[in-house]
């Protein structure tokens, strides 16, 4: 039975990925922020979904030692870590000249450096066992830029560079590394943003979706969390053993333009 660590998995995309792995019989290590009771309820719910066991570790993604402990604790519990899904991320939108340096540091730390620390801690075990899967959740913003998102765009571009390097270093050890690059994803957070934008701009929510949120996506449809989760599961499989070092857009045609 294989074991997967998914960071930022107490809500949104990460939770959807964790659920799919749990349903398919993996041991799952959750990580993320939230109310303690709600996190435990989520863990318990996922624990009933499949044959594997689901645990939670509250490592702070800005603390390398805590990330190392996350990996060590999971290895001690399950014997091995087979799959990493670096997903944790935050966002801040501001002009470069007004962008708070502390926000820049936090976004680079959580969205990029935490993935490095996670991979660094797990890589020796993966090399020893001659198997590993690293599946980072990057973004269309790892391939293209948007104004006012300097830190996020820099971090996601950096993630693709990290993934390519991991793919090259891991190739002879049966380790693959790939990045999923979603466009706009339908999550509760985005739904709230739609409502707020509609109110602020005196627009209908439908017009906000097509003319503002999904303007960049030719399909004019949100990416679904389940679609990302399905791709992550496939990339973890033996059938995907020759897919490595890839940035895989799932963005309704955004980056094809």
Across the structure, where does each feature detected by a protein language model lie?
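Conserved glycine-rich cofactor-binding loop
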Residues: 10-12
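Active-site helix of classical SDR
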Residues: 119, 155, 163
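Residue(s) in the substrate-gating loop at a strand-loop-helix junction
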Residues: 139
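C-terminal substrate-recognition "lid" of short-chain dehydrogenase/reductases
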Residues: 116-119, 123, 131, 219-250, ...
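Conserved glycine-rich Rossmann-like NAD(P)H-binding loop of the short-chain dehydrogenase/reductase
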Residues: 24-41
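Substrate-binding pocket helix/loop in short-chain dehydrogenase/reductase
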Residues: 95-96, 103-108, 213
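Short, small/polar-rich loop/turn modules that mediate ligand/substrate recognition or access, typified
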Residues: 171, 176, 243-245
């Amino acid at each position: 039975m294989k074991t997967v660590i998914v960071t930022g998995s107490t809500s949104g995309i990460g939770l959807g990925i964790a659920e799919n792995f749990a349903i398919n019989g993996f041991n799952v290590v959750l990580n993320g922020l939230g109310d303690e009771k709600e996190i435990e309820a989520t863990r318990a719910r996922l624990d009933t979904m499949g044959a594997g066991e689901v645990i939670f570790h509250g490592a702070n993604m800005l603390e390398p030692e805590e990330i190392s402990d996350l990996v060590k604790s999971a290895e001690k519990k399950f014997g091995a870590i087979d799959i990493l899904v670096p997903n944790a991320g935050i966002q801040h939108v501001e002009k470069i000249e007004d962008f708070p340096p502390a926000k820049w540091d936090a976004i680079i730390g959580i969205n990029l450096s935490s993935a490095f620390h996670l991979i660094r801690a797990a890589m020796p075990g993966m090399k020893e066992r001659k198997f590993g899967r690293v599946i980072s959740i990057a973004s269309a913003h790892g391939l293209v830029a948007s104004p006012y998102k300097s830190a996020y765009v820099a971090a996601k571009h950096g993630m693709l560079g990290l993934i390519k390097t991991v793919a090259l270093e891991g190739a002879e050890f049966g380790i693959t590394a790939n990045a999923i690059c979603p466009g706009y994803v339908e999550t509760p957070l985005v739904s709230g943003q739609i409502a707020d934008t509609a109110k602020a701009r005196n627009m209908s929510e439908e017009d906000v979706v097509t003319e503002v949120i999904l303007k960049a996506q030719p399909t004019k449809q949100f990416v679904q969390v389940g679609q990302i989760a399905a791709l992550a599961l496939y990339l973890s499989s033996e059938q995907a053993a020759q897919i490595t070092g890839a940035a895989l857009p799932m963005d309704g045609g955004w980056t094809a333009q």
